Design a protein with these regions (language model features):
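Transmembrane alpha-helix/interfacial motif
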Residues: 2, 33-80, 84-85
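Predominantly long cytosolic amphipathic alpha-helical stalk/bundle segments
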Residues: 66-165, 176-188, 215-248
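Alpha-helical transmembrane segments
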Residues: 45-65, 167, 174, 209-224
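Hydrophobic alpha-helical transmembrane segments of polytopic membrane proteins
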Residues: 199-213
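Residue-level signature of catalytic and energy-coupling elements of molecular machines
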Residues: 34, 52, 85, 101, ...
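Hydrophobic alpha-helical transmembrane segments and adjacent short intramembrane/lumenal linkers
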Residues: 185-199
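Short, strongly hydrophobic alpha-helical membrane anchors
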Residues: 1-32
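Juxtamembrane loop-transmembrane helix junctions in multi-pass integral membrane proteins
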Residues: 22-38, 147-153, 157-160
Length: 248
């Protein structure tokens, strides 16, 4: 017992310092960060804010696209007139599938207008009627995918770059912390805790920006892939209907 008591007495200052370190004010740590670490934190915070704005806006856009596409497909297969479906497609402008149909319908109208409303397959073949419709569908689908993918690359960039930017801030902060410790000539827990926490908070900011970005980036890419598949399937079905009806 006489040997253990002095050991606890010697540890008491260190334990007190650890307790004080546990009560660190992280807001104050951020405010007292050096210029380089502060610039890193502001950059990561800005990237996180922009990412969340993109996530919210893109989630609403893709949800609207999916709902209206399902509504349009139901109307398409229940209707017997292309002109009435075209009016429905105009009302469902957020649906990429409806916009693909509109492009195909407009091109089909041009082809039928050229042949005077008569079903003359040789003349239509010479003008490349069905090929024109197919190209119009493909162009519209590519345009819709491009529009849906807008701003998503920023999420991918944030997901891949933010951890490294945060790591840079941490490395810089640790270098600064060790320099301060060297100048003070004292390396106890109370001296080390605050500057090391200041350095590590940059990594925390990097992860805070990167994790939602990578999760929603993969989610949005998956949703867009589904919509792209729906546009492709619809284009094939629409071309089959056009061939049977106008080019048989």
């Amino acid at each position: 017992m006489t040997l253990i008591a002095p050991s606890f007495a010697a540890l008491r200052p260190a334990l007190g310092a650890a307790a004080r370190a546990g009560d660190l004010d992280y807001v104050e740590i951020v405010r007292n960060s050096g210029p380089v670490v502060m610039a890193v934190l502001l950059l990561l915070l800005s990237a996180s804010i922009v990412s969340w704005a993109i996530i919210f806006k893109k989630w609403l856009r893709l949800r609207q696209a999916q709902v209206q596409s399902l509504e349009f497909l139901d109307a398409f297969w229940q209707s017997r007139r292309l002109d009435s479906i075209y009016q429905k497609a105009e009302a469902l402008s957020a649906s990429p599938v409806s916009q693909v149909f509109r492009a195909g319908y407009v091109e089909l109208s041009k082809v039928t207008a050229r042949k005077g409303g008569e079903n003359e397959s040789p003349l239509v073949d010479q003008m490349g009627g069905i090929e024109n419709v197919e190209r119009a569908l493909k162009r519209a689908a590519m345009s819709e995918v491009t529009a849906l993918e807008a701003t998503i690359p920023f999420l991918g960039t944030t997901a891949s770059a933010a951890p490294f930017i945060g790591l840079f801030g941490t490395v810089w902060g640790i270098m600064r912390a060790f320099n301060d410790i060297y100048q003070m000539g004292n390396a106890n827990l109370a001296t080390v805790a605050k500057p090391i926490s200041e350095a590590l908070i940059a990594t925390a900011f990097g992860l805070f920006a990167a994790i939602p970005a990578v999760v929603f980036y993969n989610y949005f890419v998956s949703r867009i892939r589904v919509l792209d598949s729906e546009m492709t399937n619809f284009s094939n079905d629409f071309l089959n209907i056009v061939r049977r009806t106008f080019f048989a």
